[in-house]
């Protein structure tokens, strides 16, 4: 038996034991957060089990809470989840947008601060990209961030901020330098949601 065959058998057994019946059919996906909205008690159990295993973000490094799986192992995980009808336990901008950017560009300290919480669904993230007059043209953003000691003072507007009414935290693009060239001088900034 190859390592991948052994992994498939272990994965199949783990899923059979740990995936609650209600999570083996189509339905809502939890977005996490401090006050998560579970449509069924099994949803909370599934999120906790998959988060503990790192399988909400299976290919992220284990040192940041992810599963540390190779592409081949992740393919097997997805195939075995599909075979029993298991749905993903967590969906969020943290997983889809912020996490990959942090893995690529963040400092070690920033990765350790944010990634484990994303894996476990600890926070519901919203994005602050679009601005009045610029829509999806992110290079034309005008919201400014001015460094003030260890902090930034942010001044500007964001619109169409999906899920801002439910989010615990926001990640947004802000300008830290002059607008020319307009693709330079931008920063991805994370912050507690303004509703805190």
Annotate each PLM feature.
Residues 4, 54, 107, 127, ...:
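Buried hydrophobic positions in well-ordered alpha/beta secondary-structure cores of metabolic enzymes
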Residues 122-129:
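A short, Trp-centered hydrophobic/proline-enriched beta-strand micro-motif
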């Amino acid at each position: 038996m190859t390592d991948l065959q052994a992994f498939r058998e272990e994965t199949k057994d783990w899923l059979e034991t740990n995936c609650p019946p209600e999570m083996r059919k189509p339905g809502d996906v939890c977005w996490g957060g401090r006050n998560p909205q579970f449509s069924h008690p099994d949803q909370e159990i599934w999120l906790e089990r998959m988060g503990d295993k790192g399988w909400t973000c299976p290919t992220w490094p284990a040192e940041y809470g992810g599963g540390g799986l190779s592409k081949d192992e992740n393919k097997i995980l997805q195939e075995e989840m599909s075979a029993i009808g298991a749905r993903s336990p967590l969906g969020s901008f943290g997983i889809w947008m912020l996490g990959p950017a942090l893995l690529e560009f963040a400092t070690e300290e920033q990765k350790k601060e944010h990634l484990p919480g994303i894996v476990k669904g600890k926070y519901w993230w919203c994005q602050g990209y679009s601005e009045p007059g610029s829509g999806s043209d992110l290079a034309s953003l005008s919201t400014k961030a001015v460094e003030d000691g260890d902090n930034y003072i942010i001044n500007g507007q964001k619109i169409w901020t999906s899920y801002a009414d439910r989010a615990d935290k926001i990640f947004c693009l802000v300008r830290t330098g002059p607008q020319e060239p307009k693709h330079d001088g931008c920063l991805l900034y994370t912050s507690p949601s303004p509703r805190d």
